[in-house]
Amino acid sequence: MNWWIVLSPLFCGLVVFFIRKDFMQYTLLIGTLLLMRQWGSRWWNVLAVCILGVFGLFLHEAYLFWGIPLSVAVLYGYTRRPAVAVASSLLFIGCFALMCVYKGDSSNVEAILDSWHRLLGDEYHKSGLSIVALGWNAVHTFWVHFNLNFHVSLFEVNVGWMGAVIQLLFFMAAYYFILNFSWTFRRQTSDFTAADRTNLSAIYLLCALTLLPMFTILSCDYSRLYQYLFVTSYAAVLILPRGVCTAMLPGRYLTYVGRMNASIDRYLPSSKGLMVLLLLLLAVAPYSLNLYLAFEYSVVGTISEIFMRALRWLVHLV
């Protein structure tokens, strides 16, 4: 397995915020996969996985759309019992429903912000903190995110709802990248087999489907969303046995994904040069659709920024 993909902003996200709950949830998910690999379908292990899933939800409810689907799929892959998958799904959905009902209101927002103000003083701005979303109603939340996601301006040019097309094109580029990077740079066939490639892309597409509400009406934080996709997909393929990855996904679905990947190989074959180019340039803005900001967060943009800062420092010394 080639680890250079970790350098991609799509994989590492905003690592400067490593203390955020997202990275705690990644740890929970990886722990869940390790538990299942070690102890399998034992009843107490299934219970432990469910407890970890509930804890992940209480860390951040977005876990329902990426960590929970994979956890349920893994439970089914090991137990081969639909009842276990259904029961665990109902448990997680029930917890999520309770969180939606008791999410808090504007008074809770003010209490939280006031407590922060006593600690941080004037070093934060209330209008720029996502915590204020606790006071929003559902319709307002959906519309704000939908508008940010698809009705956008690029380089000061208003492209309107063409943002939806741009989003789709970027998603296709990200899929092509994750599909081919490890495959193109594998040293031996056994390092990353054709089955691994199919499983990786199938899990990626499945997580993308379950994350669709986040990509449309519940979020606009693309650095987090694509990191969810990349970390989840690679964690599953690297930790779980190949047979479990295959068993937890529908056979027809895997066949369809395999055929789609074969078509991509036929019409747009990969190369090491193309993969390096995507590694250096393919990035996404932390939030909303902004090509300039996306370039700043790319590997090339980051190196350029470091170079310019060093140059300004040298000029200042002179």
Spans of features found by a protein language model:
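Aromatic- and kink-enriched transmembrane "portal" helix at the membrane-lumen/periplasm boundary
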Residues: 2-27, 58
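Specific aromatic-rich, kink-prone transmembrane helix
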Residues: 25-53, 69-71
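Membrane-interfacial, low-structure loops and terminal tails that flank and connect transmembrane helices
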Residues: 32, 184-199, 245-273
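Membrane-interface alpha helices of multi-pass inner-membrane proteins
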Residues: 46-61, 66-72, 94, 263
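Hydrophobic/aromatic-rich transmembrane helices and adjacent perimembrane loops
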Residues: 65, 220-242
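Perimembrane helix-loop-helix junctions
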Residues: 67-92
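Membrane-lumen/periplasm interface segments of specific transmembrane helices
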Residues: 84-178
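Transmembrane alpha-helix segments characteristic
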Residues: 192-215
